[in-house]
């Protein structure tokens, strides 16, 4: 069964998308307009260095079984997806567009995974005995996580 997957972020997201495309899933990358235009026109390529090989292995999204599209955050409805991936660096979630989409993701209750450079604050809140409030200043803007239910 193929799934519709929303990935916020094209840089980290392309790496994860390349793996998911092997499974025949449909991926939508949320990114900046110039990135979206390029991905929609030419797909993306991920180069993976492999020990013992002179050249990296190149994964071309156009040659994989799944389908990838890209676009900005405006107008994206998380409820249209089976899974959301958080694939941007933590400070980027406070930017206009990303902040609103992240809030919509939280309120949609669609399953959400993260490959961020630090764990989302609601994920940290699940750790028993940890002073969650003491960690809020470590985030660029901890309020972007307030709509998420850590359960």
Residue ranges and their predicted role:
Residues 5-8, 22, 27-30, 39, ...:
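Weak global preference for isoleucine
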Residues 31-81:
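Conserved N-terminal Rossmann-fold NAD(P) cofactor-binding segment
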Residues 16-19, 23, 38-41, 50, ...:
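Generic local-structure boundary detector
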Residues 2-5, 20-22, 59-62, 87-90:
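Short linear motifs at secondary-structure transitions and domain/linker junctions
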Residues 1-52:
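NAD(P)+-binding Rossmann beta1-loop-alpha1 motif at the extreme N-terminus of oxidoreductases
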């Amino acid at each position: 069964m193929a799934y519709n997957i929303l990935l916020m972020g094209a840089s980290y997201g392309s790496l994860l998308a390349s793996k998911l495309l092997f499974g025949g899933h449909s991926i939508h990358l949320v990114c900046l307009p110039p990135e979206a235009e390029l991905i929609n026109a030419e797909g993306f390529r991920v180069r993976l260095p492999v020990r013992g090989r002179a050249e990296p292995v190149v994964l071309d999204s156009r040659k994989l079984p799944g389908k990838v599209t890209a676009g900005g955050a405006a107008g994206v409805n998380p409820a249209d997806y089976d899974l959301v991936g958080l694939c941007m660096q933590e400070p980027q979630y406070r930017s206009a567009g990303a902040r609103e989409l992240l809030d919509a993701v939280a309120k949609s209750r669609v399953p959400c995974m993260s490959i961020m450079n630090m764990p989302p604050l609601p994920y940290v809140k699940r750790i028993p005995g940890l002073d969650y409030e003491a960690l809020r200043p470590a985030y660029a803007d901890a309020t972007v996580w307030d709509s998420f239910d850590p359960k």
